Amino acid sequence: MMFRLTSVSCFLLVIACLNLFQVVLTSRCFPPGIYCTPYLPCCWGICCGTCRNVCHLRIGKRATFQE
């Protein structure tokens, strides 16, 4: 009976650990400077290709069509 109780306890402990890892991995976010997407969000700031505090607009020459 003692062996059965121990194996059931170990089994339940493994299930609890797997649930904990799932919560940690699914709520993962990225710090500033790391690549991000809408599905892999930034911990703080906003996603501009990489996690940043502010997205800066790139102003410059526009590309021209060449034939």
Curated annotation (Swiss-Prot):
GO terms for cellular component: extracellular region. PROSITE patterns: I_CONOTOXIN. Coiled coil: none annotated. Residues 1-26 form the signal peptide. It is found in: Secreted. It comes from the Eukaryota. Disulfide bonds join 29-48, 36-51, 42-43, 47-55. One of its GO terms (molecular function) is toxin activity. Expressed by the venom duct. The keyword GTP-binding does not apply. Residues 63-67 form a propeptide. Contains 4 disulfide bonds. Here are reported disulfide bonds proposed in [PubMed:16268797], even if the connectivity known for the framework XI is I-IV, II-VI, III-VII, V-VIII. Its main location: secreted. Belongs to the conotoxin I2 superfamily. Negative results: has no effects on Kv1.2/KCNA2, Kv11/KCNH, and Kir2.1/KCNJ2 potassium channels, and on Nav1.5/SCN5A sodium channels. This is Kappa-conotoxin ViTx.
